[in-house]
Amino acid sequence: MKKNEQKVVFLDRDGVINKEVGYLHHIKDFKFIDGVFSACQYFQKNGYFIIIVTNQSGIARGYYQEEDFHVLTKWMVKEFSNNSIDILDVFFCPHGPESTCNCRKPNPGMLLDAKEKYNIDMNNSWMIGDKEADVGAANSAGINNTILVKTGHNIDESHSQAKFILKSIKETIGIIK
């Protein structure tokens, strides 16, 4: 690690932090996945900052407004705070799958923006997601420590580039050190 570089656990949102419900934008539909708070407390105790990186194509598709996303995000970050967890930042891509933007995973834009903003040591950071796009974005950004969790989308384990495939985020305790 270079001087003043931070190590980070990057988390996808839907399917990692909360149960996947498809275009989530109402607080009433948000259900935290069991073990997410204890895992995040563990990451912090081990010197990691936590950043959320999430594709939100529901904005581009017109299913909800960007303001709806911000209201839900503010509430979610407060819930983390109520559990003694500091979320350093939340990066999101509002574009649809057909977009040529660099921020939509599997492109690395959100991770690279975070690296620049917070001087992150990508070699000692981790990405936890529920889709191969999360792994692709991480690898393209120089993060080789990747975990896919089975609490979101189905994972083709035989073709995955993830370093670990686990049942849920709570199984990351002990793996991330």
Q: Where do the protein language model's features map onto the residues?
A:
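Acidic, Mg2+-coordinating phosphoryl-transfer loop and its flanking beta/alpha structural elements
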Residues: M127-F164
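Active-site neighborhood of HAD-like aspartate-dependent phosphohydrolases
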Residues: M1-F49
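Substrate-recognition element of Asp-dependent hydrolases with the DxDx(T/V) motif
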Residues: V36, C40-T73, D86-G96, A138
